[in-house]
Amino acid sequence: MTNSGYNSSRLGFKGVEDLGGGLKAKFWLEAGVNNDDGSGSATNVNNQATGGALAGMNGSQGLTFNRTSYVSLIGNSGEIRLGRDYSPQFWSFTVYDPFGTNGVGTTQALNSSAGGVTIVRASNSVAYISPNMSGFVVWGQMYFGENASNAASQAGDGGAARVQYDNGPLSLAAAYSKTTTGAGTDVQSTNIAGSYNMGVAQLIGFWNKDANTGAKDVTGYTIGALVPVAPAGTVRVSFSNSDNGAGAKTDKFALGYVHDLSKRTALYGTFASLSNSGGAAQALNGAITPANGSSTGFDLGVRHAF
């Protein structure tokens, strides 16, 4: 048994205070919860692969606000955030994947495996999010590894930017991030995505590239659709490909259905199949998969939000 096959299980607190004159103060604290066993999830304090995590996932650290922990000021000119938050380039992974970033259907793990520690979230960040400007929203972020100024490496320092355009049924986005990983090394992530809602179906496309210093570029793409089934169901389907630039490739197909019992409760089921070639050994949700092997997986569950 596992959790978060449809949405990530979480417990959080957020609030907004009206300061007057069009200015608001906001806070957001959100902790990941593994509701199948009651454990919490580790956070990362310095955006680095070593020395950053408080403990291994599901470890003795208990509950941490690993998902979100920031304060912000919001005004007519946009929002400024300080703390731990999503990386702007990650947002397209969840917006433009029919399966979001959860369960056997998602391609997030498949197509961001080379993106480094800050591929999803960054600690010690300063971000600006613009207001909607004729359909355009711009999101810029800088984050820091909190190393000594004279350290040989400024690992964990970096930045990201994202622009999204929405106009009726059309949605487009592009994003880029760069994070220092060591002395003279970094990881750069780029993605371009879009969707078009035809009414009978929402068509979705996504492309990404991760570039690590001294390694081949890893590229991937996803095409898929969301098909509403009246009155309370949605069929989800996607095909994805990942290529590590050295001949290792992975193809993945996913098909799922979500049935809303109410605004807060839904039943879901997903089937996914993955195949590797050229020495690739990608897996579904950690399943043991040998090089050039394949795996299949199923999700059946219930999501309740409160």
Where are these regions (language model features)?
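Outer membrane beta-barrel
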Residues: 1-145, 155, 164-171
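Short sequence motifs at beta-strands and strand-loop junctions characteristic
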Residues: 3-6, 61-63, 118-120, 153-155, ...
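Membrane-embedded beta-strand positions in outer-membrane beta-barrel channels/transporters
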Residues: 10-12, 68-70, 125-127, 160, ...
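Residue-level detector of the transmembrane beta-barrel scaffold of outer-membrane proteins
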Residues: 24-28, 79-83, 137-139, 171-173, ...
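Structural signature of outer-membrane beta-barrel domains
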Residues: 32-36, 82, 87-91, 145-147, ...
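Extracellular loop and loop/strand-boundary signature of outer-membrane beta-barrel proteins
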Residues: 55-57, 148, 210-211, 241-243, ...
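Detector for outer-membrane/organellar transmembrane beta-barrel domains
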Residues: 154-260, 272-273
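Outer-membrane beta-barrel "beta-signal"
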Residues: 259-261, 293-306
